[in-house]
Each structure stands twice: as C-alpha cells, then as structure tokens.
Amino acid sequence: MTVQTFIPNGAKAASENTVNQPVHTSDVSIKKLYIETQGCQMNEYDSHRMADLLGDSHGYVLTTDPKEADILLMNTCSIREKAQEKVFSELGRWRKLKQQNPDLIIGVGGCVASQEGDNIQKRAPYVDMVFGPQTLHRLPQMLDQHQDQIEKPKKDKIKLVDISFPDIEKFDFLPEPRVEGFKAFVSIMEGCSKYCSFCVVPYTRGEEVSRPLDDVLAEIAGLAEKGVREISLLGQNVNGYRGETFEGGICTFPELLRLVSEIPGIGRLRYTTSHPLEFSEELIQCYRDLPQMVSHLHLPVQSGSNAVLQAMKRNHTIDVYIEKIAKLRKIRPDMHLSSDFIIGFPGETEQNFEETYQFIKDLDFDHSYSFIYSKRPGTPASELEDTTSEAVKKERLAKVQHWIKQSSIRKTDAMQGTIQRVLIENVSEKDPNLLVGTADNTRLVTFVGDPMWVGRFAEIEITEIKTLNLVYGELLNLEPDVA
C-alpha cells in the first residue's frame, strides 16, 4: 500500500513505461487541481472521478505541483495507523502553502475523513472541506458553499463536513469517465459486510451496496468504445457483487463477468479485492470459459493459521482456501497468485506464524501486500491482548517478504522462452523503436514494433529477463485491431 500523487488513468510508472501526465499551462486564469491519493485502487478510482467531476463542474485542470494548485484534495486511507498519521503530516505541509496563499482550498476525503469527520478540522482548522467516499459526488456543491462563506464573519461560517452513506447515489451524479490509455478501473460495489475483526472498512465505507447491472455494463461499453481494452472491476468485496437487473432480478459476480466478456473491444478482465468466501465454483468456471480472464489472481487470506483466521473472524479455514486454489490451478496451471498477509496479529504464536510461512510456500505466492498488524480504533481486534514484541513481528515480516520476493524472481525467470499475451500500451521513453505492454501476470514486456500497434494485443515470445518486473521479447502474432 503506497501513497502516490494522482495522475491520470493508465498510471503505473515503471522503468520502461510512459504515462499520460496532466496538462501543464502557464495561463494563470486556469484553475488547477492537485489530488494526492493514498491506499487502494478504490481510492485511485475515486480520485479519477473527483478530477472528472470538478473538471466538468468548475473547469479545474489537474496539476502535479501542489504549489501551483488552487485546490488541494487528499483522498485518504485508514487501513493502517501509519497511513492515517501520514494524512496529518501532509496536511502540515499543506498548511504552509495556505499561509502563502490564503485563497487556497484544502479538502480531505476518503476513509480517514469518514472515520474522523469534523475532528480533522479541529486538529487542522485550515481544512475547508471534509467528505467521505460515498459523498465525493457532492464536491461541487461543497465547493460552492465554501465560496459563499468567504465573506461571512468567522462566527457565521459552518463546517463543511459530509461523511454520510447515501447508498450508491454517487454514481448517479458522476460525469462520464474520461479515458486516458487502454486500461480502466470500474467500481461495481462499495463497502463491506464481512466485519473482519481487524478491519475498519465497514465503518468507513459502509456495508456492501452493489451498483445496478445496467449502469455497470453501460460504463464499460462506453469505455470500450473509447479504446479501453482492459477492465479492472473494483470493490472492497468485489466477488460479493449482487447487482439489480433491469427486470428486478439479481446478477451475481460470475454472471457479470460473462456479460462483460461479451462487450466488443474488452480483451482482458481483472478484479480486486475478492474474499475467499465468495470465490465460488461458478467464479472458478469463468476461468475455464472466458479467455478474457487473466491468469493472475489477488485473493486475500491474511493468515495461514486457522487459529488466527478464527480470531480475525474470516469465517473460512485454510483447507477451504487451498481447495479453491487447487481447482483454479487445475483449469489454469499458469495462474499467478498474490494475497494479503497480516503479520503479528494479537495472539499469533510462533507456531501460528510457521503455519502461515509454510502455507505461503505451499501455495507458491509470487506477490503479496504484507504488513505488521496495525490496531484500528473501534474494531474488535483492538481489544485483544498483544504480547508479541515489535522486533519479533519485524523479523517474521522480513522472512515472509524475502521468500515471496524470491518466488517472484523465480516466476519471472521462468517466463524465459514462454509465449505471453501482451496488451501494448505505449512507446518506450528510452527507445522509440520499442513498444511496452503488460502480460497477464502484470510483468512489463518490451519488444521492437510499430507505434501504430499501440492499443492492440500481441503474442510475444520472451527472450530476455531484465529485472523482476521487466522482460524483453519478440513479436510472434499481432491480434486484429478491434477498434
């Protein structure tokens, strides 16, 4: 989990990858917006939508320099304590910018905003607006309210805080998403109803609410018409999707995947974040039937110990997880698997950890988001006694991360001589004769080709391993352009 400056869609900067940047302009009459995004891909998606929204409503243009911005927005994450403290650390830096420019508008959104509410303005009174993940669509109105209050005496000003949970209303008010590049995120549901003992998501984003099926399909079809070829479906518990159909029925997540696969132009499907409980037989069969489904799965498990899973209230066992992955790999032997791991959960014994470590090796994960447990106020786990020292936790985490990194290296090395289906995304910054794309397993693939091929899929034979995430190859076959 990282903190990153918001940049337009397509935006994973890498050694051989070029990205679309916000337009820079010297015209001081143009209002400029800076968004800092913390945390998950849901937040990244929300930041895109904030930019679309304020661009349409107030004409704001994105900038990568907070010093030249007229409005600063921070889209926050509260999963871990350190991430939460980074919010106030960054706000301290933004305070200096506001001292230099009193007209600067500062807004805080996301999960920390939802959790802290007006406490943010008590701790940082120079913050003008606080809004939650479900109320970002009200930003234009909040901005207008702020402008209306500028001339009022301080005693007459009201705090602009909106952290309510108006179901799925926000999607009805967001503009059509802008397209930059050939990949796009599409949020299909919000919130989570699992109430794992360590997690704040149900309290900061609310319980699970699915977008109507027709809305999701219409958004994806619109993106495909604009050249998007890879869709990543998003949700805190994305495979628990149950969207209402036009006829009043319910569409499950596997049914949604099958419908999306029929949309012309969509050549690749990903999703995150999923839960083992809803990783159903029907979902596994989608990997058998739908070539658009990538051979890469992120399925958070959190621990490889049944005792720890029970304390986490995950409501499944390790055997259930292993059985589902075995079925999936029988269909897709080349499946790359990643997961989330919480190390040092309260009560985790040395035996519990060793069970997790062995589990990681047995399932051969090649990527993970692994962290030391972070106590979150208001969660059941925050009341549990924690007797493990920080030194032991750090040692355990290092052991897990080292093994997974070595596994990732082995899997990248094993790509030598294989044929990979690659989405060609851009021309290399370093060499105009080279094209850059991504394989199913997220590795960057570089090869010699015509810039006119950008946006198409190709079969590439891997000829050289450059780094952990970068390989070189040669073109074997260029798929027809579906545009």
Curated annotation (Swiss-Prot):
Residues 31-148 form the MTTase N-terminal domain. Its cofactor is [4Fe-4S] cluster. GO terms for molecular function: 4 iron, 4 sulfur cluster binding; metal ion binding; N6-isopentenyladenosine methylthiotransferase activity. Binds 2 [4Fe-4S] clusters. One cluster is coordinated with 3 cysteines and an exchangeable S-adenosyl-L-methionine. It comes from the Bacteria. [4Fe-4S] cluster 1 binds at C40, C77, C111. Residues 178-410 form the Radical SAM core domain. It is found in: Cytoplasm. The keyword Cytoplasm applies. Gene3D superfamilies: Methylthiotransferase, N-terminal domain (3.40.50.12160), tm_1862 like domain (3.80.30.20). GO terms for cellular component: cytosol. SMART domains: Elp3. SUPFAM superfamilies: Radical SAM enzymes. NCBIfam families: miaB-methiolase, MiaB/RimO family radical SAM methylthiotransferase. Monomer. Belongs to the methylthiotransferase family. MiaB subfamily. PANTHER family: CDK5 REGULATORY SUBUNIT-ASSOCIATED PROTEIN 1 (PTHR43020), MITOCHONDRIAL TRNA METHYLTHIOTRANSFERASE CDK5RAP1 (PTHR43020:SF2). This is tRNA-2-methylthio-N(6)-dimethylallyladenosine synthase.
